[in-house]
């Protein structure tokens, strides 16, 4: 459930002030330029299991190009113009890049990064800019990590787990075998699924933690070993309607579909996943939007594209 404050308070007030103040002075023609930046922070992490899952070098940026073009269409009638700078950064480069952009008058930042990157960006911006979180689903960013200048486009783990729980219960797949990873973000996601299960009347008939011990999963021998281990890992669990995987780190979930000891559907971080965008979306102009993304980038739209476009 979403909770809203009784009054807009400083968050909305600050946002309205920034929206009313363009990043450059109005010229005599009353033409106004609005400048934004989309920063993707590429933190180090494990390689995906499949090369098909490797992100494109410009991942997310097609949404920025499309969003800026859409703004310009309406802006032309309002004597407004829009510029958006896109950049992929290492985590240590975020601070100097933001200071440069803030110094140039940029007041809107769309951040594609983990919760640490989003928090750092919001703290750096202070009252000088509004930050849009277009990627991190961390519940803590919406609770104790909330900032007055931070707006969320990406849904939270709580929202996504609620969506999945509602569907599974509707399908009467209400008995779950929950497998969560050993990383802190995996444990947080597992907690979100437990809350969702209690909220919507599902039961956790079995729980297990998958310990990340590293290993050569992308070599031939590593692949064979992983394929043999997954069924055994899921063996002996109490009867369940499906497996729910909590694997933010991307260590094990992709191996679960069709590899469980008992033939059961897999949901969560693999298999049936709660997402903000899917190629099957057709209503509300979705087909036209996806066709435009494909024409622009040569690839199918992703959640990152959609969330960046929404932010702008």
Model-found features: residue ranges?
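Extracellular/periplasmic bilobed ligand-binding domains
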Residues: 123-131, 175, 184-288
């Amino acid at each position: 459930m979403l909770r809203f404050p009784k009054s807009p308070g400083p968050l909305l007030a600050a946002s309205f002030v920034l929206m009313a103040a363009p990043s450059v002075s109005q010229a005599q023609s009353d033409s106004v330029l609005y400048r934004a930046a989309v920063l993707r922070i590429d933190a180090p992490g494990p390689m995906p299991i499949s090369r098909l899952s490797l992100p494109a070098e410009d991942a997310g940026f097609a949404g920025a190009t499309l969003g800026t073009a859409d703004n310009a269409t309406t802006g032309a009638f309002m004597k407004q113009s829009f510029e958006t700078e896109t950049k992929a950064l290492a985590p240590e480069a975020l601070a100097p890049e933001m200071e440069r952009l803030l110094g140039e008058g940029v007041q809107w930042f769309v951040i594609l990064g983990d919760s640490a990157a989003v928090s750092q960006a919001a703290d750096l911006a202070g009252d000088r800019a509004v930050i849009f979180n277009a990627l991190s689903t961390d519940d803590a960013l919406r609770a104790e990590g909330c900032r007055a200048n931070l707006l969320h486009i990406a849904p939270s783990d709580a929202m996504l787990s609620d969506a999945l729980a509602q569907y599974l219960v509707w399908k009467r797949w209400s008995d779950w075998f929950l497998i969560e990873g050993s990383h802190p973000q995996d444990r947080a996601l597992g907690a979100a699924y437990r809350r969702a299960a209690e909220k919507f009347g599902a039961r956790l008939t079995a729980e297990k933690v998958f310990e990340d011990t590293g290993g050569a999963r992308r070599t031939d021998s590593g692949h064979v070993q992983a394929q043999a281990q997954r069924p055994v890992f899921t063996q002996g669990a109490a009867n369940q309607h499906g497996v729910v995987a909590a694997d933010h780190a991307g260590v094990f979930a992709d191996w679960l579909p069709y590899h469980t000891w008992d033939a059961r559907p897999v949901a969560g971080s693999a298999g049936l996943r709660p997402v903000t965008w899917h190629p099957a979306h057709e209503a509300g102009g979705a087909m036209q939007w996806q066709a435009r993304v494909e024409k622009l980038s040569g690839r199918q739209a992703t959640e990152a594209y959609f969330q960046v476009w929404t932010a702008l």
